[in-house]
Amino acid sequence: MIVTALDPTHPLAAGLTHASRLVRSYQGERQEVTPVWFMRQAGRSLPEYRDLRVGTRMLDVCLDPAMASEITLQPVRRHGVDAGIFFSDIVVPLKLAGVEVEIQPGKGPVFERAVRTSADVDRLSAVDPAALAADTFAAVQEAVRLTTAELNETPLIGFAGAPFTLAAYLVEGGPSKDHLRARTLMHAAPGAWARLMDWTADLSGAFLRAQVLAGASAAQLFDSWAGSLSLRDYAEHAAPASARAFSHVRDLTYTVPSADPDGEAVVRAVPIVHFGVGTGELLPAMHEAGADAIGVDHRTLLDEASRRLGHIVPLQGNADPAMLAAPWEVLSGHALDVLDRGRAAPAHVFNLGHGVPPETDPAVLTRVVELVHGWRA
């Protein structure tokens, strides 16, 4: 593989974030203080977010660099978390590639035309992600640059939807409880399914790469719907596409100078995280797709997840979001149990098993951050 060095001004290459607790944990180095951030930390649980969103549409906000940056920064300022997670939506790259999609409040992404046949896949893939105009992701990259300029030594995590989840949305035409149509296409028209997965992989990969090149210090794929698949179907029909998406950022590297004046500098790759919902049985396959760290949802205990991964993979997770509304003695006990079980992995980044519920009291999240930062293994 030919490697590509990040620009010297990139936060990793410039020495701002390469030694952060988050980046080092993703690379397998256990930290004295466990890093913590929350999926959907930027969102409806924050009053400042709700104020900013009045009268706006989700996709418009995602493509407004100043607003996307401000929303990304809000939870970092409020909670003191160890990372920002770029504020966007998994359908943004689809929108930028010309797919007609809108996010309907209370429902989620809704597509003008579902992708149900081989002809539909051919129509969609007529737009080659590799041939998109150079400025396709310009608004996204500007938002990343604005954000990292304020974050300084706090790393920003870039994110994208995993190829299977994007494909499932496209085939279903919107949200689904069982993703039956997607699984049907997978088996009824395997050739069309493979082309669809290659296309979503390249689009997700390009979206991730744009964020990393603009300043993100890590990259995470979110596979919200992978839990609907058997291990066999995931390994055969989804994991190769995730690996293909990761390949778009796997070549990006930076150099860390040696602490020893006579030592040699070390070249490191941008860390990659793979998270899925309901994927306890899929964890080894998710890791084999090329991730450095694995996100675990709340259904699988972290020590069990580490066992399934041979105790060699850094883990992220996995407090139950429902616990955020429980009394503090219940929540704190749960968080401490997560931290204790996380010791089974070589390194651990504390997070939730899914996103922050909109009704969560922000003060509770701040208190969880303080608890995690005060804990010692």
Swiss-Prot record:
Stored SUPFAM superfamilies: UROD/MetE-like (SSF51726)
EC number annotated for this UniProt entry: 4.1.1.37
Organism domain of life: Bacteria
HAMAP family named among the record's database cross-references: URO_D
PANTHER family hit by this protein: METHYLTETRAHYDROFOLATE:HOMOCYSTEINE METHYLTRANSFERASE RELATED, UROPORPHYRINOGEN DECARBOXYLASE
Protein family membership: Belongs to the uroporphyrinogen decarboxylase family.
GO cellular component: cytosol
Major localisation: cytoplasm
CDD domains, alphabetized: URO-D
Transition state stabilizer, annotated site positions: D89
Function: Catalyzes the decarboxylation of four acetate groups of uroporphyrinogen-III to yield coproporphyrinogen-III.
UniProt keywords, alphabetically: Cytoplasm, Decarboxylase, Lyase, Porphyrin biosynthesis
Subunit structure comment from the entry: Homodimer.
One of the GO BP terms on file: protoporphyrinogen IX biosynthetic process
Gene transcribed to yield this protein: hemE
Molecular function GO terms recorded: uroporphyrinogen decarboxylase activity
Amino-acid positions noted as binding substrate in the UniProt annotation, renumbered to this chain: R40, Q41, A42, G43, R44, D89, Y169, S224, H354
Pathway noted in the entry: Porphyrin-containing compound metabolism; protoporphyrin-IX biosynthesis; coproporphyrinogen-III from 5-aminolevulinate: step 4/4
Protein name per its UniProtKB record: Uroporphyrinogen decarboxylase
Subcellular location per the Swiss-Prot or TrEMBL entry: Cytoplasm
Catalytic activity: uroporphyrinogen III + 4 H(+) = coproporphyrinogen III + 4 CO2
